[in-house]
Amino acid sequence: MSKEPTAAAGLQNRFRTHYCGLLNRDSEGAGVKLGGWVHRIRDHGGLIFIDLRDHTGICQLVIQPESGELFRIAEGLHSESVISAEGSVVLRSDETVNPRLASGAIEVVVSAIKIESAAHPLPFPVADYMPTSEELRLKYRFLDLRRERLHENIIFRSQLTAAVRKYLTDLDFIEIQTPILTSSSPEGARDFLVPSRLHPGKFYALPQAPQQFKQLLMVSGFPRYFQIAPCFRDEDARADRSPGEFYQVDIEMSFVEQDDLFVILEGMFKHLVETMTTKRIAQYPFPRISYKDVMNRYGSDKPDLRIPIEIQDVTELFVNSGFKVFASNTKEGCCVKAMVLKGMGNESRLFYDKAEKRARELGSAGLAYIQFKEEAPKGPVVKFLKEEEMAALKEQLGIETGDVVFFGAGKWEQTCKIMGGMRNYFADVFPLDRDELSFCWIVDFPMFEYNEEDKKIDFSHNPFSMPQGEMEALEQHSPLDILAYQYDIVCNGIELSSGAIRNHRPDIMYKAFEIAGYPHDEVDARFGHMIEAFKHGAPPHGGIAPGLDRLVMILRDEQNIREVIAFPMNQSAQDLMMAAPSEVTAQQLKELHIKVELPEEEA
């Protein structure tokens, strides 16, 4: 919660001279005016107690029966009505002190009270927590935002945003706003399109990110840029992704290398964690893991490093195995992976059946495992393995009696992802420390990948990243062996941001697009404005853009991103409170030269 002076500095008027949650023993004897919401009201045998709430907290008002008209007004109050009250601060008796409230040592004896706004019956309680459907919470978001946890989340978000601004401006970053109405880009997610009235048949797009603008700012000579940037993407919702719009801490720097950006971001996150939370960072500086290594060891490019399980490669152990399922996957491009769960080898059959079901959901044909029981190893693949293979497994994996080892075999990428999915599935077995923040950088992403569907080389991630080795790499190396200066920052299994050192040279850009099958004229048609700018002197530059919503979500221990956004949409990208999206009038459509053709309803 924000810390403000007890007196309402600069706001002393007929409504308020003090804040409820900031009154304390030092306020004894003070005459105060308070304004807020009726949190609770209790009638204790002639005395009426009102818990009055403002954004700083709660204080108790006392109305005595001899108050006459005041008592009558208080008797008619309902929860969440807005009142203003005047009175004197007195100390509570020792036995009535409420240690759960910051103002619990005092109460205000009321001498005047006024109902500013009477509340109708509530669709759900604000003062007392009661499970409430998300639909109802979003429809009455103005009530939901009064609830303590959500209210504190929004205040925390404001404080975090202010701290980010101060940290970056202290490092000589310049905050610059970029356009909200811009041109549509065919790359990435779907755009939100805005029709132009003045240019019939043409459309603006809301920016998916200020990517091109911030790079152009580097070309314009601004060395360090940032913006708390709104971004708009027409994509489906997830627990950690809000549909429609989100905010990111957009950062770009010129004349930098990858390590320079890492130092800035690590310092900022460390500062935010240490000054705004009681959490601790597991390792600082943050560990850096190559894409290939992170897939081999964790089966995901956004690993939760708190999970005490690591995937190991056992391909070499089965090159000459009689177990064909493993032996057939020791060839180039395939692998055999293993994962040990310490002390979990004596679980019930149901445990393994559920695990196999999850593996099939992830795309596996099944789930091979061996339980290393005290009497003898047990499991569906034991009979296929030789004694020396079992011994080699135990030695390489450090297996002890009571452990269980799970296997995956097949094409490298698919097998890694399935094993990574199982690693996350088994995470529930282990108590994870919610106060530990395991940040890491994922680096050395491949520049290109082979598109199986189109049977061609394509960009694996950002086509505007600088290839490691620059032009020499593009001309002399196989495309699938080229790495890019691309990086992700991950915390506790959540990707906070992607970033890159940009490709600022038109010759390298043309060559990279040529490898991916794009001729010069197509590159010029799509990105001519960027290339034109780069032809007029572009400095080396790079950037990153951590998601503000996700960062608040992690630091506040929330499982759903809608718990850190004031007015979010639902899973179907609808604003239930404002009834958006909505139909518009025929006149509005006519002015925009638009005709709506709705899809035919299925029979």
Curated annotation (Swiss-Prot):
GO cellular component: cytoplasm
Localization per record: Cytoplasm
Nucleotide-binding recorded as keyword: yes
Enzymatic reactions: tRNA(Asx) + L-aspartate + ATP = L-aspartyl-tRNA(Asx) + AMP + diphosphate
Binding site for L-aspartate: 187, 233, 461, 502
Molecular function terms from GO: aspartate-tRNA ligase activity; aspartate-tRNA(Asn) ligase activity; ATP binding; nucleic acid binding
Pfam family, one: tRNA-synt_2
Alphabetic keyword roster: Aminoacyl-tRNA synthetase, ATP-binding, Cytoplasm, Ligase, Nucleotide-binding, Protein biosynthesis
This protein's record includes keyword Oxidoreductase: no
Site (Important for tRNA non-discrimination): 44
SUPFAM superfamilies: Class II aaRS and biotin synthetases (SSF55681), GAD domain-like (SSF55261), Nucleic acid-binding proteins (SSF50249)
EC nos: 6.1.1.23
Amino acids binding ATP: 233-235, 495, 547-550
Region spans: Aspartate: 211-214
PANTHER family registered for this protein in UniProt: ASPARTATE--TRNA LIGASE, MITOCHONDRIAL, ASPARTYL/LYSYL-TRNA SYNTHETASE
Complex formation: Homodimer.
Function according to Swiss-Prot or TrEMBL: Aspartyl-tRNA synthetase with relaxed tRNA specificity since it is able to aspartylate not only its cognate tRNA(Asp) but also tRNA(Asn). Reaction proceeds in two steps: L-aspartate is first activated by ATP to form Asp-AMP and then transferred to the acceptor end of tRNA(Asp/Asn).
Record-stated family: Belongs to the class-II aminoacyl-tRNA synthetase family. Type 1 subfamily.
Name this protein carries in UniProt: Aspartate--tRNA(Asp/Asn) ligase
Protein species of origin: Chlorobaculum parvum (strain DSM 263 / NCIMB 8327)
